[in-house]
Structure formats: C-alpha cells, structure tokens
Amino acid sequence: MTVKCANDLDTHTKPPFVARMIHRFAVPIILVWLAIAVTVSVFIPSLEDVGQERSVSLSPKDAPSYIAMQKMGQVFNEGNSDSVIMIVLEGDKPLGDDAHRFYDGLIRKLRADKHVQSVQDFWGDPLTAPGAQSNDGKAAYVQLSLAGNQGELLAQESIDAVRKIVVQTPAPPGITAWVTGASALIADMHHSGDKSMIRITATSVIVILVTLLLVYRSFITVILLLFTVGIESAVARGVVALLGHTGLIGLSTFAVNLLTSLAIAAGTDYGIFITGRYQEARQANENKEAAFYTMYRGTFHVILGSGLTISGATFCLSFARMPYFQTLGVPCAVGMLIAVAVALTLGPAVLTVGSRFGLFEPKRLIKVRGWRRIGTVVVRWPLPILITTCAIAMVGLLALPGYRTNYKDRAYLPASIPANQGFAAADRHFPQARMKPEILMIESDHDMRNPADFLILDKLARGIFRVPGISRVQAITRPDGTAMDHTSIPFQISMQNAGQVQTMKYQKDRMNDLLRQAENMAETIASMRRMHQLMALLTENTHHILNDTVEMQKTTSKLRDEIANFDDFWRPIRSYFYWERHCFNIPICWSFRSIFDALDGVDQIDERLNSIVGDIKNMDLLMPQMLEQFPPMIESMESMRTIMLTMHSTMSGIFDQMNELSDNANTMGKAFDTAKNDDSFYLPPEVFKNTDFKRAMKSFLSSDGHAARFIILHRGDPASVAGIASINAIRTAAEEALKGTPLEDTKIYLAGTAAVFKDIDEGANWDLVIAGISSLCLIFIIMLIITRAFVAAAVIVGTVALSLGASFGLSVLLWQHILGIELHYLVLAMSVIVLLAVGSDYNLLLVSRFKQEIQAGLKTGIIRSMGGTGKVVTNAGLVFAFTMASMVVSDLRVIGQVGTTIGLGLLFDTLIVRSFMMPSIAALLGRWFWWPQQGRTRPLLTVAAPVGLPPDRSLVYSD
C-alpha cells in the first residue's frame, strides 16, 4: 500500500473556467491591461497631481477643537476655516521704524487679498504690541486666518498666495519674513510627500530588481515580473486617480504614498506566488499547461484572499473619523482590488505567453531539504518551538510598555522646507509655544463689557495661568500676557491720593502761615499789655485832670462873675468906645474896646469849661470801664494764640501722617504694578470709554461683547504628551473659575495645537479600535471562508495579532531606543491596519498548502507544505518587507516609520510566525486545527499506484 496525496487525486481534474479563458486569451488580456494602463497614464492626471487637486481636509469635523475653531471664526468674523499661519519678522538687530513700515505695508496687502480671511494685527497696535514681539526685540509675528481647511487645495493656494505677497514685498536690509505655522507645515508636508514619491518608487524598483535577480537568476524573468508589477501599479494608481479626479473620493499624501508602495509590494508578492508555484509544478515534471493550471489552482484563492484581506482591512479605515486614516480607506481598497484583478489575469497571461518561449522555466532546482528539516523539527518538537517563538515575540512585546509617541510634526519633516525654516527662526527669539497657541473662548448671553464681568474674565485668565505647564495667558485684562499696568486696586487707591499729594504743599504752607500769625498775635498781645498799662496811667491822669478842670471851672466862674461886676460898672464908659466912629483910628480907644471885647470871651470860656468838665467826667467814668476790658481781651488773644499753635502742631502731625500714608500707598501701588500682581484687578467704568481700550477689546471680545477669548501659551511644546494632557486641566480651570459667578452657564470652547492633537489622539485610539476590530473580523471571515476551518482561521488571526504587537514593539525598539526618535502618532494606526491585512497572506498560503497536503497526514502535510512553500513565501515576504521599508527614503519621516514598521512586521511574520509559530500550533492542535472539519492525522491508505503513474512530486525535490 502507498500513500496517495491530494495532488495526485487532482491530476486529471478539469481546469477552472477562468484559468482556461486566461490561458486561451492570454495575449488579448495583456493588450487590454496594457491599453488600460496607457489610457489612465496619458489621459488622466498623475495620482500626485490628483492628490493635490482633491486633497481633503485633515481636520476631523466632529472634533471639539474643530467645532471650537469654527465657532470662534463665526463669532469674531474671522473666517470659517481652521487654516491658520504665522508670518514671522526676524531682524539682525532690534526691529525699528523701517521694520514697522515694512510690516504695515505687508498687512495692507494681506488684508486686500481674497485668500486672507482675517489678520490678528497685534504688533501694529501699541497696546498689544509687546505681546507679539520677542524679548530681545529682534522678532515679531502676525497671525492670519486663510481660506480653506488644512490639507485642502484651497488652503494650499491660500498659503502660496501669502508667500507670493511676502516675496514680492521688499524687506528692509537685515530683515527676513518667514511664513510658518501649522497650516504651512501641512502644505509643505504634501509637497515633500509628493516629491518623495519618485524616490520611493525608484528605490522600491531597485530593491525588487536586486531581490528577484538573486532569487530567479534570470534577467528576463525579473523584467517580465516587473512589467506585470508596473502594469498593476499604473492601473491601480490610474483608476484611483480617475476616481479622485471625478470627485468621487478624496486623497491625501499618506494615501498616495501608501497605495503606491502597497501596489508595488503586493503585485510583486503575487508575481512571486504565481511564478514560484509554476516553477514548482514544472520541476514536478508537469507540462507547461498542466503546471499553469496547477499554479492557478494553488494561488488563485490565496491571491484573492490576500487581496480581499488587504483591501477589506484598509477599507475598514473608512469607518474611522480621523481624515488621516479615513482617506486611506477607499483609495487603498480600490487600488488593491485593481491590483488583485490585474494579478489574477495579467500575471497568468504573461506567464502563459512567456512560458511558450521558456522564459519562466526554473534555472535551478528549488531547494526544499532545508525547509523540510525545519518542518520536521517543528512537528517533532512543536511545544519547544512555540515557546521559543513566543520568547522571540516577547522581545518586541516587552518594548511596547515603553512606547512614547510624538506629536511634533515639524520633527518629521526636512529642516529645509520653508515652514520649518520659519519655525527655526521663531525658536531663535520666542518660546516654542508662541507659534502654536491654544485659544479658549467663552460665550455668554449678555454684553460682558462692564467692570463686574471683567473681574470674572480676569479671574478666568488667572485660573488658566495657574495651570501647571502654562507660561502665558493673553486676554482683554492682560493684552500682553501679564497683568495690565495700573489695574490693581492698591495702585488705583494710590492714584486717589494723587490730588491730596499735590495739594499737600499748599496746605503745609497755609499751616506755616498760622505759625506766623501766632507770632504776630504774640506781638499784638504784648502791645495790648503795654496799652493796658498806659491806659491805667491815662485813667489816673484823666481823674486828676477832672479834678483840676473842676477847680479851673470854679475859678473861671468866679472870674466871670468878677468881670461881670466890672463890666456892669464900666458899661457907660464902654459904650463910648462903641459909639466912637473913629475908634479904630484912635489907638487908646481901640485898645480899650479890644479889652472889653476880650472880657466878653471869659463868659464863653466858662461855658466851654462847663462842657469840658462834663466830658471829662464821662471820660473819668468810661476810662476805668475801658481799662477793665483789656485783661479779658489779652487773655482771649493769648487763648487764640495757644489754640492756633496747637492747631499748627496738630495739623503738622496730621500732614506728616498723611504724607507717610500717601508714600506707603504710592509705594504699595508701585510695588503691585512692578510685580505684575494680578490678585486685585479692577477696571473703573471710565476705562471702557477709552479709545485705545476700545481698540484692544476688538481683539479679545466679539463685536457685541457676548464672547471673549483667551490666547494661552504652554511652557513647553504643546505638541507633546504633557501639552496634550494640560487641555483637560485648562478646561477644568476655566469651569472652576466661572463656578458661582454670573458667567457660570457660559459655553466654553477650546482650540489650538494641543487641543487638536488631543482630539486626534483620542480619535486615533478609537479609530484604531474600530478599524482594528472590524479588520480582524473581516480577516477572520475571509480566512474562515477560504480554509473552511474555524480554528485554523482563529489561529491565523491570533498569530497575526501577536505578530502585530511584537512587530510594533520591534519598531519601538529600533526607532525609539536605538535611533532615539519617537514614533509619530500616525504610525501606530497606519502600520497596524496594514500589518493586519498583509500579515495574514503568508499564513493563509501556508494553511492553504496544509489543506492541499492533508491527505498525506497532518505532520507529513506540514513538512511537505513547508518544503513546498518555504522558499517562495520567504522570498515574497522579503520582497514585500524590503519594498515597504524602501519608504524610509521619503522626506516625510512618518512615511519612513510606517514603512519600516510594516517591513519589520513582515520580516517577523515571514521568518518567525509563518516558519515556526503557525506550523507548531497546527502540530500541537492536530486534527482540532481543522475543526469543524475532520482533519486527517494519518496518511490516506489506498491501493498501490499502477505502473507508469507519475511519482509524487513532493518527493522528487532535491538540494
């Protein structure tokens, strides 16, 4: 009795219809695909051009940061896109008036351009200029909002328009204007990715050419394989370009790069599968046609399953929310379906035509003894082999906990691109975060332009500023990022004493006048005391005068009486003197007449003396009374002088105290101002009427006053794990600051670099879960359909998942721990999905061969399968791995990291999983590997084969 294998049972099986049609119409098939390739290459723009034309926005539309950015643009009338760039002015000396004139001219041109939606002109306003200029004074910047979202064609056109304006505006000597920012970086990333495509393709072709020459040792065979791969790649790229050009799908530079590499690598793999299986059949003494059909039966389902797996897994990326991943889904899926269609038709057709001329004949025997020995070792000691492979996998798995991602896009782009040069210029003068700020906006239901709400806004700004990792917060209450001058309550209190301080000198002078007045009063008191003494003497003299006058009056009265007697007796004679007409001329007459007239005056004197005596009596009565008034008057004046001196002394002390208080208040106010202390902010109502302040409010408050925004700068790089982690802290700080205030119910929006990357990180994690689970389910279903064995399909998926973790760990070990470069945040999702897809190819091919050889028994079938597929699968895996690793020559380091990660995964999957882990698991599980099918652990015993039966081809191979 002999063992009869499945291949012998299928020797006379009727070939499949599709295989027969391809074999019959090989030349027309080649011509059709060639015509299609020429058509899509000539009449449809290149994939790179279409990628620029149909470049989609890379911002997730449902992300909170994107919604916040849109809301801010709407509220502040600054546009409806998320495309923001910076223009940095750098001088070799502090920027002066010539720089300001250049800047003003640049701003005028930018405002007039249709691509510029808004300009945040901080440096042009003296109130906000310090916040936009570096500490050394040699650099300043302006922020622009442009038309088009990041990654879109309109955004790239807008950036080109801004750069054109900057180039066409002559700068003063020593001053350079740089266009930079996140949007400019993305635009340059697209340009770099597209320019690198030729280099990646050329490198891939060289790698494939060298590898295939080493494998086949036939230049013609390699050229025909490359011809097939070229047609596959051209048609796949052309069809995707057609779909993109007609607007049916969107593209990104990642999709263009990955699709090209996948199409080339997968096409080469399929060519190796086809050629290897054909040569294997030819060495088994099958004729060319029989070998063709054997090849088709052995590879059709593998290539179809592989293509469906890759296209299905990449299509699962369409379920992702992140445009970075979403744009990979349909283009890569369509491209791979086209590549599979070409591989299943053009590849066999080229093989058919080439085989007619002997171009695909093996140049040497396929060496299988080494792989059979490996198979023998595996089936003999499956558990130790499995443990060993798991230990090898642990090398990568143990590196996973130390995985650190990086969100700093500029670090993964060439330093020579314009945006990176602008960032480098900014880094020379500004902190890293200055070009990548966070913006927080609150929106209330009322106008916040009042002192009460400004207290809350400043409290909010202070709360955010106190978040660990935040270095600066610019707001209407702190336009330059620090507490506004003269807005502290102590300073305003000190300003209230300004008028008092100004009048203090005059008040002290008037107090000094009181001192002089007291001195004058002292002199007056002394005079009054002297006058009192004199008045006492005068009173005494007056009394004496009165006595003397009374005596005199008595004497005069007596004299009058005596003269009256004399006059009476002498009257007749007297009359004579008055009768004489010529008395005046007679001397004796006139003299006697004058004597008698004088005697008449004695009577008048007596009357006057009587009157004088009365007056003197009154004076004698009044003078004592008047004298009595002087002591109280002197006492009163002395009291007044004492009070005046006391007032002077008291007020001098009060004024000194007031002076000290004023000095303390002024010192305190100056100290609060100098220290930029923001604990006691207050703006009086009159400030809101100030023209300069109104102009500043336009930058931080909406036109209706219902919204206010805050520009937040990190202490370190916002595109870091710490920067992203601070976003929740910022939002929490804002909520806590508003809690219990009239603005408690306001809506909070947060956008910016760290906010965007936080959304990307969370979205990428969810997208990875969604795409990963859907891909695993899809792969499992495809494997289940092809293998018809639940356990086998589960083992394939399980080993792929294990290989995935180990492969990514090896990439972490290589890039992070050996090269010192952290993996970009996009690498994980992109490489994982692709590895899920391509990692199952070789396991599927091996398991399919297990199924073909199962009639020889499980262990024998494993040995034969490994002997028959070992070299082919290894070659295919190496070519695929090296092709994907060729992406490392891209200017985009992230593309290189994705390629090397996939390459490492393919190497691990080819050399470890497919060669040792998968067959050892199959050997351990035995017949349960094929559950629910009935696996055969022993060879099928049949009647001996008749004479002339072709020998078992699995036994004719030799080294």
Curated annotation (Swiss-Prot):
Top-level taxon: Bacteria
Task: Write the record's keywords in alphabetical order, separated by commas.
Answer: Cell membrane, Membrane, Transmembrane, Transmembrane helix, Transport
Q: Name where it's found.
A: Cell membrane
InterPro entries per the UniProt record, alphabetical: MMPL_dom, MmpL_fam, Mycobact_MmpL
Q: How does it sit in the membrane?
A: Multi-pass membrane protein
A Gene Ontology term for the protein's cellular component: plasma membrane
Q: Membrane spanning segments where?
A: 25-45, 205-225, 239-259, 300-320, 333-353, 381-401, 766-786, 790-810, 818-838, 872-892, 902-922
Query: In its keyword annotation, does this UniProt entry include GTP-binding?
Result: no
NCBIfam families assigned to the protein according to its UniProt record, in alphabetical order = actII (TIGR00833)
Protein family per UniProt: Belongs to the resistance-nodulation-cell division (RND) (TC 2.A.6) family. MmpL subfamily.
- Per its record, how is this protein called by name? Probable transport protein MmpL4
Protein species of origin: Mycobacterium leprae (strain TN)
Which lineage ranks, top first, belong to the organism behind this chain?
Answer: Bacteria, Bacillati, Actinomycetota, Actinomycetes, Mycobacteriales
